[in-house]
């Protein structure tokens, strides 16, 4: 439980930024598109943590959450007995697809270099690969990532907002 409480400030910050972004998108305030693009970029960048080694001073040793971005600790390695190298290769591939998808979706959000019509497909594809990557390394610390992916799926599938048809549907 203590570990989950450590996520509260980050989760609260993400919720606040998301609410402000939603407000701006709902009222067709131009900055809303840029805020959403920023959220997509940030979410994509977090996935790059899978290429960095776990910090020396592990939070798990102090009673906190274990470093969640370690592909070598994947349940496929520890429980299913798959080779860590294969799992790492799959994970890095998913990470690169996720990162590229979110970067392209962010560009499509603001209509720079990527057609706005591609936005929904890019967001759905990036969230699908993100979710697959998060499932590889299931951890309570990654619940926020699952939540962000779910919110993005709802945003696209419920046709709540799109750079092609802004503002939010009422």
Give the residues covered by each predicted segment.
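Membrane-interface extramembranous regions
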Residues: 2-170
């Amino acid at each position: 439980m203590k570990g989950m409480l450590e996520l509260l400030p980050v989760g609260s910050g993400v919720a606040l930024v998301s609410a402000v972004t939603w407000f701006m998108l709902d009222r067709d305030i131009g900055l809303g598109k840029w805020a959403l693009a920023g959220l997509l970029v940030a979410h994509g960048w977090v996935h790059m943590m899978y290429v960095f080694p776990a910090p020396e001073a592990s939070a798990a040793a102090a009673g906190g959450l274990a470093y969640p971005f370690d592909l070598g600790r994947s349940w496929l390695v520890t429980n299913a007995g798959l080779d860590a190298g294969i799992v790492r290769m799959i994970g890095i591939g998913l990470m690169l697809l996720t990162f590229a998808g979110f970067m392209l979706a962010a560009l499509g959000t603001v209509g720079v270099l990527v057609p706005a019509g591609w936005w929904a497909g890019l967001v759905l594809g990036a969230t699908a690969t993100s979710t697959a990557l998060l499932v590889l390394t299931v951890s309570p610390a990654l619940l926020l990532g699952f939540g962000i992916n779910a919110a993005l799926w709802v945003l696209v599938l419920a046709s709540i907002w799109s750079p092609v048809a802004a503002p939010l549907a009422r």
